[in-house]
Design a protein with these regions (language model features):
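N-terminal cationic amphipathic segment used for targeting or macromolecule association
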Residues: 7, 18, 27-29
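Generic detector of low-complexity/intrinsically disordered segments
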Residues: 15-18, 41
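Short, charge-rich, low-complexity interaction segments located
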Residues: 25-42
Length: 42
């Protein structure tokens, strides 16, 4: 499972959404602390 920092997530949100839609799960971290898990709905 990939972890991205919040700045990278804001910069590349469209790409991350596309990756999640393909089934890739990842974590968004702030200051090195995991905050949320992003995963596809289906």
């Amino acid at each position: 499972m990939q972890t991205v920092n919040i700045h990278e997530a804001k910069t590349h949100l469209s790409r991350l959404v596309e990756e999640a839609a393909k089934g890739n799960v990842f974590i968004i971290a702030k200051a090195g602390k995991p905050m949320v898990k992003v995963l596809p709905l289906s």
